[in-house]
Amino acid sequence: MTVEAEETSMDLRFKVAGRISRPVHEVFEAVVDPDQLSRYFTTGGAKGRLTTGATVTWDFAEFPGAFPVEVVEVEQDRRIVLRWEAADDAQSTTDQPVAGAAYFTTVTMEFEALEGDRTLVTIAEEGWRRTPEGQRASYGNCEGWTNMLCCLKAWLEHGITLRSGFFA
């Protein structure tokens, strides 16, 4: 697993990556399929398959409220681009989407087939404002995406769910 942080004068961004010992199509499907995603990552439930132009909802049991996710681009077995609200200290205590940051970040996931039916998954997120809240939110999301990669690996390679109890 690699973690790379970059800071520019305009925004905050990061990139995390990890290798999964499964074929690229299987790994890709575990991300775009809401039933699979709900088993290891969006433990409060995911609604909607990731397809270009769709808006889906992700809910995390540890964080109240559902998060709307705009699917900007899906290239089968290669790339997923998402946009969602930056969530700078925004919290929801209802079933309504989290709102409050008034700007969005962009998440780019890339899937690369490796030898031996392995897959390199790289996740980058960018677009936070250079504020203390933006910095905290970017660090929190970096932790979240790193956790997602670990959970994805454990789920696909060993059939176990790591997320339960990790954050709360």
Feature roles, as predicted:
Residues 27-28, 37, 56, 71, ...:
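Hydrophobic pocket/interface hotspot
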Residues 24-25, 72-79, 110-120:
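A short, structured loop/turn motif at beta-sheet edges
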Residues 28-31, 40, 58, 84-86, ...:
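Tryptophan-centric aromatic hotspots in well-structured domains and transmembrane helices
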Residues 154-168:
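Short, highly charged C-terminal tails/helix-capping segments
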Residues 91-147:
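Beta-strand/loop substructures that line and gate deep hydrophobic ligand-binding cavities in soluble
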Residues 55-61, 82-86, 95-98:
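Short beta-strand segments that buttress and anchor functional surface loops
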Residues 15-16, 35-70, 75-79, 164-167:
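Short beta-edge strand/loop motif at the mouth of beta-sheet-based domains
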Residues 1-47:
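Hydrophobic ligand-binding cavity/cleft-lining segments
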